[in-house]
Curated annotation (Swiss-Prot):
Top-rank taxon, per record: Bacteria
Organism of this sequence: Bacillus amyloliquefaciens
Identification of the protein by name: 6,7-dimethyl-8-ribityllumazine synthase
This protein's UniProt keywords: Riboflavin biosynthesis, Transferase
Any GO CC annotation of this UniProt entry: cytosol
Record-listed (2S)-2-hydroxy-3-oxobutyl phosphate binding positions: A85, T86, R127
Assembly, per entry: Forms an icosahedral capsid composed of 60 subunits, arranged as a dodecamer of pentamers.
Gene name for this UniProt entry: ribH
GO terms under biological process: riboflavin biosynthetic process
Assigned protein family: Belongs to the DMRL synthase family.
Physiological role: Catalyzes the formation of 6,7-dimethyl-8-ribityllumazine by condensation of 5-amino-6-(D-ribitylamino)uracil with 3,4-dihydroxy-2-butanone 4-phosphate. This is the penultimate step in the biosynthesis of riboflavin.
Length: 154
């Protein structure tokens, strides 16, 4: 049996990151976690490009555009959606998730889902580097692994 898996060495990888500006006090921490983790795994800082968009709903569009350039070995998406009093949360979360998944499958470039979806602002803060770790850092590790896995299929 052959086991195919990606390693966690970022040397030589070019990574795109799309970040939603809405709830920027949280998404900026997700971005810092992602950048720090990428660099610690060997990705050069000048091989990381960041595109800011208004919010989570716009992330799939920019992620797909980045992936279509074929300049990136992986694209990380980072955003925060916090439930409010209306159904807006459900629409944004569902469409962002679908769009991010489609961006990866349509382009053949790994597109990593890093939208923090929570019931409360406290839960979002916890996932941006406090009690529950940093989702941006987790996504960076996934991006490195998937980029290397994708290379193994070429």
């Amino acid at each position: 049996m052959n086991i195919i898996q990606g390693n966690l060495v970022g040397t030589g990888l070019k990574i795109g990151i799309v970040v939603g500006r809405f709830n920027e006090f949280i998404t900026s921490k997700l971005l810092s976690g992602a950048e720090d983790t990428l660099i610690r795994h060997g990705v050069e800082s000048n091989d990381i490009d960041v595109a800011w968009v208004p919010g989570a709903f716009e992330i799939p569009f920019a992620a797909k555009k980045m992936a279509e350039t074929k300049k990136y070995d992986a694209v990380i998406t980072l955003g925060t959606v916090i439930r409010g009093a209306t159904t807006h949360y459900d629409y944004v979360c569902n469409e962002a998730a679908k769009g991010i998944a489609q961006a990866g499958t349509a382009t053949g470039v790994p597109v990593i889902f890093g939208i923090v979806t929570t019931e409360t602002i406290e839960q979002a803060i916890e996932r941006a580097g406090t009690k529950a770790g940093n989702k941006g850092a987790d996504c960076a590790v996934s991006a490195i692994e998937m980029a290397n896995l994708n290379r193994s299929f070429e």
